[in-house]
């Protein structure tokens, strides 16, 4: 890892449980509390349902679901042991809420993640651990310009399909995450929050 003032940055694969445990052990060693975690890692695979193989599904689930499952489990044990008032924010997707062509594997992981979030929220509310999930729509990221240029027809469809007639800005998702990890949301757990310009309501 690299050390920068009071910030420690770890690089690695989120499915590497040894790395995850190392992060928490380091926080204990440095006498720092991890009050919140945001699970944002994910991979997407486009493939027709009848072309999908079990291995394809396993690969997507490994990153999008099982790694987050393990991180949440380790974090809950950590929070309970050190009596930390904690907040977990998972990042879902509108693809996990509605059906999308050629995204059966990806959408399944996001649907499973939403259920996991709610279950953990209910089971560990008594331990002062909150868990919520943010459901972004189409958001402008580094992928945006390439998508707009290479898939103009699909891009125009997403604009027209979204009631607010635009893609979201990344800071609009970040603002929701900041709210959910703050004390301003101290009575909120087991909930999902759509940041999608009205997509799922239309």
Residue spans of the language-model regions?
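Substrate-binding pocket helix/loop in short-chain dehydrogenase/reductase
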Residues: 48-49, 56-61, 158
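Active-site loop-to-helix junction immediately N-terminal to the catalytic Tyr of the SDR YXXXK motif
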Residues: 52, 99-107, 119, 147
């Amino acid at each position: 890892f690299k050390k920068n003032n009071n910030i420690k940055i770890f690089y690695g694969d989120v499915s590497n449980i040894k790395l995850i445990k190392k992060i928490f052990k380091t926080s204990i060693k440095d006498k720092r509390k991890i009050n919140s975690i945001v699970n944002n890692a994910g991979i997407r695979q486009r493939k027709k349902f009848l072309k999908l193989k079990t291995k394809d599904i396993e690969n997507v689930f490994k990153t999008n679901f099982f790694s987050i499952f393990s991180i949440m489990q380790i974090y809950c044990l950590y929070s309970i042991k050190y009596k930390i008032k904690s907040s977990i924010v998972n990042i879902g997707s509108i693809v996990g809420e509605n059906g999308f062509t050629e995204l059966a594997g990806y959408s399944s992981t996001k649907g499973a993640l939403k259920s996991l979030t709610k279950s953990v929220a209910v089971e560990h509310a008594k331990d002062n651990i909150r868990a919520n999930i943010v459901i972004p729509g189409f958001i402008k990221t580094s992928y945006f310009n390439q998508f707009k240029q290479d898939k103009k027809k699909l891009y125009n469809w997403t604009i027209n399909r979204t009631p607010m007639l635009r893609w979201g800005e990344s800071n609009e998702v970040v603002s929701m995450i900041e709210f959910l990890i703050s004390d301003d949301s101290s009575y909120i757990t087991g909930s999902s929050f759509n940041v999608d310009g009205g997509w799922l309501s239309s």
